[in-house]
Amino acid sequence: PDKNTQRVVGSVDVYKRQLYNYMTVNPLNLHWEIKGNFLLNCNCDVFCNCPMSLGRAVPNSPNGKCFSWWGINIEEGYAEEKWSGFNPIKRESKGIMDLSGLNVAILLEVPGPLGSGGWTAGLYIDEKASDDAADALAVIFSGQAGGQTGWFRHMIANFLGVKRCSISYKETDDGWSFTIPEILDGRIEHEPGKERGEVVKVSNLKYWVAPEIIVCKGSKRSRIRDHGRNWDFTGGSAEYCAVDWAGP
């Protein structure tokens, strides 16, 4: 297979065994922390109503459904296995895994309000990650390790699997980009504010991602193509947040 889209054969098998056979929350017993940058581009009109409604409102998209890609650039991060008592995997802890400098992307399809569940999700993990770090990221971003992403485990109804890919993140003059060759060409640009050179922000939010969001839109031909989907989010709602997450 193309190395840019190859499946994480060993890691995904381990991840699925832990997640579906043991059916335990936080199967690796991870304690984790991630600081970095979060990008999202969806098919809603600018501005998506999820941040203000906390995911309760019907998407303000042409079809009432939410299609999106998410990108997480981890500037600093770690995951650590900590066993106390019951250990379903019957092995020693792998200790601290460095997640700094890695990228993660998500393809997400939601049939209605974000908080109503029924998600179809595909996960993409940086090929630079070690197998242990990839396992940890799969557990974190499937919601099994608690923290800010913990609610994902209640929302995901159809998991499309994990792919390890070359993933790049860049900050541009007018926005940000997230790229996976042959899959994601994600580009967003911030909306200009009243004051020249200033961006539009929404602050003091209870939103799960972060309390402050920079309002953005999809740049020309911002799109994702995978798992039978071909979505173009040019002009669609987008957001950028600086994130500081931890779990459980």
Language-model features, listed with the residues they occupy:
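N-terminal ordered "arm"
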Residues: 26-79
